[in-house]
Amino acid sequence: MKRVINKVIVRVLLTALVTAVPVMLVCQTTSDGSMPQYYFQNFTPGQVKLKGGQVQTPLLNYNTVTEKMVFARDAKYYDISNPEMIDTVLVMGTRFVPVGRIFYEVLLTGPTALFIQHKGELMSAGKQVGYGGTSQLASSVYVTSVELSGGRYNLPLPADFIVKITPVYWIRRNNEMSSFLTEKQFINLYPERAKEIKAFIKGNRIKIENREHLKKLVNFCSSLE
């Protein structure tokens, strides 16, 4: 009897996590059937770990345009609309955590934690401008999401479009979040250690855009504190 009650509770919690209004799959595909707004190529079984300890395994993907976790069921998409109930989401070995109403990818945990915010912009694929070239500037039509009641999003995408993704890096130190995009911005987060960090970057040929390099750099900075 207890097991049946637990299953009912988990089912109710999962229902609360998804929006009531679905987004049809066909509305978010391009002419070739691809969905470039999504971080992963396909929806795959993932894990949604709730703060209460329950775990669900729906088909998941991450929408880089809305920065929301998306749940697929019966050929429809649902935004996970109550991220405050979630502890962690795992998709294909990648860990995400809620930050406000959106999700960040986790690269490092510990006293200094490292995250990536995947920010996607939808824009038209561009017009032909001669010699077989394509100009995005000639037809840059950005598509914005439309917020509906309850924080739900529906993206009316054009037939052909591209997604420009800009990674924003975040570190959490002393319970404070700080963002950076470049090496210089990262060094500015540690003004008292700038000389040592510059030497480490040069000596180890660190490239900020390489996540393994970045993890190594953050671990080094943590060792200085």
Each model region followed by its residue ranges:
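Bacterial Sec-dependent N-terminal signal peptides
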Residues: 1-31, 217
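Short N-terminal segments immediately surrounding and downstream of signal-peptide cleavage
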Residues: 29-45, 49
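Short coil-to-beta-strand transition motifs
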Residues: 49-55
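Aromatic-patch recognition
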Residues: 56-178
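A short, solvent-exposed beta-edge/loop patch
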Residues: 153-216
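Short, solvent-exposed mixed-charge patches
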Residues: 224-225
